[in-house]
């Protein structure tokens, strides 16, 4: 791992390069060395560096160009010197009228000074609290006030507002009109008849014009209101009507024309016109700073030219409105809550004025990610380096975009907490995505494997004595006999077989195995021990002192494995290298054609041993498995099997690496076993593996995370952590699913107040899901060599285990141990309803997600992209649970009448 560079180019001397031309770890007698004249290292490295630099610069330019493209300047009319008026709510950030928190006179005076530079008119909505001081303060700045009376179901408050407003209208020179109620009919808080009574009362008590302010269509629905007002005050807000911004201006003028035609004798006041700068999309209406700037700058100029009276809603952002109107309610101001101008009044409009800073930030973040991805990346082909460069820049750009977009939100303690958790989740998603991309690149786009442990076939090679240990617990005797027959046929000069049956209660199960061993000769020894603690690890530890004293290697296979005759002959000679402590062959299976269920299981199993283990072997970081594995006896006697861990094999392999020893792996099969017969057994097996992984991480945190007191290399630490990271991500996904369901429930119960989560937080998990499924299909096609159908089967089976893995991860973090679960062999399949009940948790969560999606569709519809995206996310989130049900159903189908014979092993 030395010689790290951004581009994966490591300077090596000429001797090292020549040695790399031969197989590094085959036995000397079998090495083939072809002399080659190496290209001068300096010239080759310079050429590679130059090519990598060009690729990085090209991709950096591509993403920077994308930032420039989405932020290209758009022309719009300059803001006029004066507009007709501003709607004004004076609440500062952190103030809530619902809690009777009102601004001070000094705060309102500063607001009025800002507005007085742009208009002569303001509209207020209430005279409650300190808002009654606004008319007096407005006189200081020469502002005319349209006074509002807030009408609500609270009759006592209504009476206070009316009395106070009448007094202000009759005593303040700044009040030029009175508005009784704001969308009170639209909110169904009062009827048109009741409002007419209030209007008549106020008109009789004041000398200025009186009206009520409603959405334009309310005036069309209740034309009788016109008899009780002096002018028509209408809200025309195209955003709420799902009108795209490019058609919104014409929509305003069309509605104004209709109202003038309907009420020709009444003056028209457009009492609210505006556009929000943030919030959910509504159909084609996008709430963005650029759209707000373009729309308002264009609209107010046209309104001025045509002589309309209007109020722009609103002068200042009002974060408190989010609780009543949804998040978009906070963002209608021309100035933000800190009283800063939100967009430029002159010149071209740019969506994100500081986009260059963001582009630079994304490049820096991408280069940091790429540096980590390219550590020890000299073996990657150019296509692999290009792919990782693209992924790094994509992740960097999206992360910067997420950070920027979230920074533009108004936050409460609740939203900050949720945002922080979502940000951590998004960061975790991108870390997982980068590690998945790294594995993909190293599996497909690599010059050659760094550590090839090919079969050693020379007759004169190192052939030490091997002791083969076969642990059994409650296994079918006939199956174990097949395993013993295969061992008896091994083509190897010196080996013994120790079979241990621990804790099997029924003599009819273990005694036939004991008797059969007696017929196979002195090589085979049988042990039955009950009780014996420590699960499988305890049984294997029991056999160590009973191993022949001259045995140098201890091999372990599961009781269902039929091994190839050449297994020991081909693989044991690798122990001639004193650094090699473990030699591992892949797990493989012979019953994949027994049922559709097992075909899917087989496809899923195959990937790890032909993709993950192969790439891990390049950095000497394989996962040791408790079958088809061999360990140097001296090492095993020193370390022993961990009886505290339910994945004692993987834990032993890690301790081997921690001592600075090495492992050898060859990806071809030398033995085949049996897969689980039912979905519940398939799940329990994977639960044990994932739970054991968390046990190991917890026990070895010091060496894995900190590199303390260990001989682990950085590459080994990376592979152990990165290899288990997707499982940890599955565990964290449970919290995301629960959060999504709770949020969706709120969207259904109070749709007017709860919007879908920000798109920026819904995209990362969806992107990771799509990438992982695509990666599985691509890698199975390229690295494993299967057809598209089998690749899809692997993806389906893998998805079906997501919930099981998630549970195992959470159990692993919050418990210290669970009972060891043996995977049954030759078990009967379950009926349909039993199989479905074994996936009842997945079924329940799937129905919840589908119900949430349906509920949102029925209550809110899917009028906007963010709503469609959220519903799609809920449905995609349900796919792993659907996959689990499919697997459960397939496992319930009847088996063939007779089980197939063990297939020949290769």
Predicted region positions:
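Aromatic-rich peripheral "rim/lid" segments of glycoside hydrolase catalytic domains that contact
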Residues: 77-80, 93, 97-100, 281-291, ...
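Aromatic- and acid-rich polysaccharide-binding/catalytic face
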Residues: 147, 176, 214-255, 275-276
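Membrane-embedded multi-pass helical conduit in multi-pass membrane proteins
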Residues: 382-431, 458, 726-819, 835-906
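Cell-envelope/extracellular polymer assembly enzymes that use nucleotide-activated donors
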Residues: 465-467, 496, 651
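Short, acidic, metal-binding catalytic loop of nucleotide-sugar glycosyltransferases
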Residues: 484-494
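A conserved acidic beta->alpha catalytic loop
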Residues: 493, 501-513, 530-533
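Long helical/loop segments within the catalytic core of UDP-sugar-dependent glycosyltransferases
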Residues: 515-552, 565-646, 651, 657-658, ...
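The conserved acidic donor/metal-binding loop of glycosyltransferases
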Residues: 558-562
């Amino acid at each position: 791992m030395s010689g790290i560079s951004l581009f994966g180019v490591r300077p090596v001397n000429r001797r090292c390069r020549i040695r790399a031309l031969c197989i590094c770890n085959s036995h000397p007698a079998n090495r083939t060395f072809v002399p080659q004249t190496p290209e001068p290292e300096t010239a080759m490295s310079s050429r590679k560096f130059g090519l990598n630099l060009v690729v990085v610069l090209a991709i950096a330019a591509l993403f920077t160009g994308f930032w420039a493209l989405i932020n290209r300047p758009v022309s719009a009319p300059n803001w006029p010197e004066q507009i007709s008026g501003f709607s004004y709510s004076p609440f500062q950030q952190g103030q809530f009228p619902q809690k009777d928190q009102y601004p001070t006179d000094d705060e309102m005076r500063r607001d009025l000074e800002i507005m007085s530079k742009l208009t002569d008119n303001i509209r207020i909505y209430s005279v409650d609290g300190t808002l009654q001081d606004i008319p007096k303060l407005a006189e200081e700045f020469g502002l005319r006030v349209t006074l509002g009376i807030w009408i609500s179901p609270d009759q006592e408050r209504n009476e206070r507002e009316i009395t106070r407003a009448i007094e202000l209208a009759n005593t303040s020179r700044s009040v030029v009109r009175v508005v009784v109620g704001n969308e009170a009919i639209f909110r169904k808080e009062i009827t048109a008849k009741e409002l007419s009574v209030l209007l008549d009362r106020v008109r009789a008590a004041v000398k200025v014009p009186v009206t009520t302010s409603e959405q334009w269509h309310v005036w069309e629905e209740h034309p009788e209101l016109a008899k009780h007002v002096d002018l028509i005050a209408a809200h025309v807000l195209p955003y709420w009507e799902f009108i795209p911004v490019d058609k919104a201006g014409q929509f305003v003028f069309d509605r104004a024309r209709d109202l003038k035609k309907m009420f020709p004798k009444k003056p028209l006041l457009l009492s609210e016109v505006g556009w929000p700068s943030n919030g959910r999309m509504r159909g084609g209406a996008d709430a963005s700073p650029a759209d707000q700037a373009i729309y308002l700058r264009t609209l107010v100029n046209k309104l001025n030219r045509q002589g309309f009276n209007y109020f722009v809603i609103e002068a200042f952002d009002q974060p408190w409105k989010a609780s009543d109107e949804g998040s978009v309610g906070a963002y209608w101001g021309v100035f933000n809550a800190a009283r800063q101008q939100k967009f430029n009044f002159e010149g071209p409009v740019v969506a994100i004025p500081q986009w260059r800073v963001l582009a630079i930030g994304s490049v820096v973040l991408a280069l940091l990610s790429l540096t980590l991805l390219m550590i020890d990346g000299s073996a990657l082909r150019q296509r692999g380096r290009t792919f990782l460069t693209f992924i790094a820049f994509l992740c960097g750009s999206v992360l910067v975009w997420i950070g920027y977009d979230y920074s533009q939100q108004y936050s409460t303690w609740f939203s900050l907490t949720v945002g922080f958790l979502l940000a951590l989740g998004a960061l975790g998603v991108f870390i997982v995505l980068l590690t998945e991309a790294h594995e993909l690149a190293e599996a497909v786009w690599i010059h050659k494997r760094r550590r090839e442990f090919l079969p050693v076939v020379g007759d004169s090679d190192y052939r030490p004595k091997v002791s083969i240990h076969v642990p059994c617990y409650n296994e079918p005797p006939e199956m174990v006999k097949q395993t013993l027959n295969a061992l008896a046929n091994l083509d190897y000069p010196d080996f013994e077989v120790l079979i241990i049956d621990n804790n099997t209660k029924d003599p009819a199960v273990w005694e036939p195995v004991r008797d059969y061993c007696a017929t196979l000769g002195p090589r085979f020894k049988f042990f039955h021990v009950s009780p014996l603690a420590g699960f499988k690890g305890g049984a294997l530890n029991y056999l160590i002192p009973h191993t022949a004293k001259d045995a140098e290697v201890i091999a372990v296979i599961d009781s269902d494995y039929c091994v190839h005759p050449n297994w020991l002959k081909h693989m044991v000679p690798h122990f001639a290298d004193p650094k090699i402590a473990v030699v591992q062959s892949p797990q493989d299976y012979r019953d994949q054609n027994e049922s559709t269920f097992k075909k899917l299981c087989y496809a899923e199993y195959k990937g790890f041993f032909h993709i993950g283990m192969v790439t891990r072997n390049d950095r000497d970081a394989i996962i040791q498995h408790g079958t088809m594995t061999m360990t140097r006896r001296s090492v095993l006697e020193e370390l022993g099997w961990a009886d505290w861990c339910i994945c004692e094999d993987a834990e032993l392999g890690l301790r081997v690496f921690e001592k600075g020893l090495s492992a050898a792996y060859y990806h071809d099969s030398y033995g085949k076993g049996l897969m689980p017969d039912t979905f519940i057994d398939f799940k329990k097996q994977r639960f044990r593996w994932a739970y054991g992984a968390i046990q190991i991480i917890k026990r070895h945190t010091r060496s894995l995370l900190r590199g303390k007191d260990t001989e682990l290399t950085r590459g080994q630490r990376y592979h152990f952590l990165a290899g288990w990271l997707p499982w940890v991500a599955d565990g964290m996904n449970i919290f995301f699913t629960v959060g999504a369901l709770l949020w969706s429930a709120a969207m259904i119960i109070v749709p007017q107040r709860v919007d879908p989560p920000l798109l920026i937080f819904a995209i990362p998990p969806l992107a990771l899901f799509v990438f992982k499924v695509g990666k599985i299909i691509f890698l199975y096609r390229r690295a494993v060599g299967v057809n598209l159908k089998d690749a899809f089967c692997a993806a389906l089976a893998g998805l079906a285990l997501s919930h099981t893995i998630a549970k195992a991860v959470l159990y692993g973090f919050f418990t210290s141990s669970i009972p060891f679960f043996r995977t049954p062999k030759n078990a009967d399949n379950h009926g349909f309803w039993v199989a479905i009940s074994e996936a009842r948790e997945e079924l329940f969560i799937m129905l919840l997600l589908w119900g949430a999606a349906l509920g949102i569709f029925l209550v809110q519809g899917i009028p906007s992209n963010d709503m469609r995206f959220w519903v799609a996310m809920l449905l995609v989130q349900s796919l792993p649970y659907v996959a689990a049900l499919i697997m459960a159903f397939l496992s319930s189908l009847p088996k063939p009448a007779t089980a197939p014979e063990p297939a020949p092993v290769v």
